């Protein structure tokens, strides 16, 4: 066990957090560690050169995008990613803004947004927060660390049932604010994201990086593809796109990394 000075130096925030929230001194007592959803390695498909999304005027960068990490993001890489691609997205967005003429608001888009808000605001029989918790539990139980087709399919059934409850949520904004409404929108988006994640996990019949299948334990060359989910007639459809060949420059960088034989003293994830 490491000394208290070592722990405070290397893990100051964690040391303080456990002390403040659980009254556990991790320099003296063991702490319970469990897997948790930490990072989204999938996301919106963007043009890698300018980070456009296919929607005019909308740019995306960072964790919201598909990213460059593949199936296993290494610690610290997300900071390098946002520095490079955040600048790229911001520069292209700024250049586009400079050249814009007057932009008129779409009354149709505004009316659609109002209709969407009004559809949520009503007295309902289901409170939003417990449904949020139900969704988290579904993803933990059916799309967690180790997955299988049987459990993933059962998860989809539960998500479809949860989705059917969305029209029945109770949303009543008051003088205190619009928290109910925000959570309702968050739940709807989370259900869509969860459904997309599970459907893609069903299609990827292999184990690769953070995606582990008990019924397909090995990496499969046939699965060297990216899975894309999109809405067609209000239904999610999953497509596969072959991965593009890396440039010679990137191939060399990866090959040079593979030549590292001694990992002593290095943090490995």
Model segments located where?
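Short loop/turn motifs at secondary-structure junctions and domain boundaries
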Residues: 24, 29, 34-38
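A generic local structural motif
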Residues: 5, 31, 45-47
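Glycine- and aromatic-enriched mobile tails/lids
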Residues: 39-41, 45-60, 64-269
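Long, contiguous hydrophobic alpha-helical segments, chiefly transmembrane helices and signal peptides
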Residues: 14, 18, 31-33, 79, ...
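An anion/pyrophosphate-binding glycine-rich loop and adjacent beta-alpha core
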Residues: 1-20, 24, 92-98, 137
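A generic short-segment signal for beta-strand/edge and adjacent turn/coil regions
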Residues: 9-15, 26-30, 181-182, 194-199
């Amino acid at each position: 066990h490491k000394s208290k000075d070592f722990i405070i130096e290397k893990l100051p925030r964690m040391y303080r957090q456990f002390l403040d929230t659980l009254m556990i001194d991790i320099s003296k007592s063991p702490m319970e560690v469990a897997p948790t959803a930490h990072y989204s390695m999938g996301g919106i498909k963007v043009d890698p050169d300018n980070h456009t999304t296919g929607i005019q005027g909308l740019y995306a960068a960072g964790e919201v995008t598909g990213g460059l990490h593949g199936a296993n993001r290494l610690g610290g890489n997300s900071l390098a990613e946002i520095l490079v691609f955040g600048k790229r997205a911001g520069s292209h967005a700024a250049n586009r803004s400079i050249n814009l003429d007057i932009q008129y608001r779409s009354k149709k888009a505004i009316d659609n947004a109002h209709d969407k808000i009004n559809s949520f605001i009503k007295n309902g029989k289901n409170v939003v927060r417990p449904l949020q918790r139900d969704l988290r539990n579904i993803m933990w139980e059916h799309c967690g660390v180790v997955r299988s087709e049987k459990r993933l399919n059962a998860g989809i059934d539960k998500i479809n049932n949860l989705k059917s409850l969305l029209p029945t949520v109770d949303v009543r904004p008051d003088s205190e604010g619009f928290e109910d409404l925000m959570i309702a929108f968050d739940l709807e988006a989370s259900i869509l994201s969860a459904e997309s994640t599970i459907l893609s996990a069903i299609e990827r019949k292999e184990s690769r990086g953070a995606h582990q299948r008990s019924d397909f334990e090995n990496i499969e060359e046939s699965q060297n593809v990216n899975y894309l989910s999109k809405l067609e007639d209000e239904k999610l459809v999953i497509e596969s796109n072959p991965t593009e060949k890396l440039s010679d420059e990137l191939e060399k960088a990866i090959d040079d990394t593979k030549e590292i034989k001694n990992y002593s003293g290095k943090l490995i994830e």
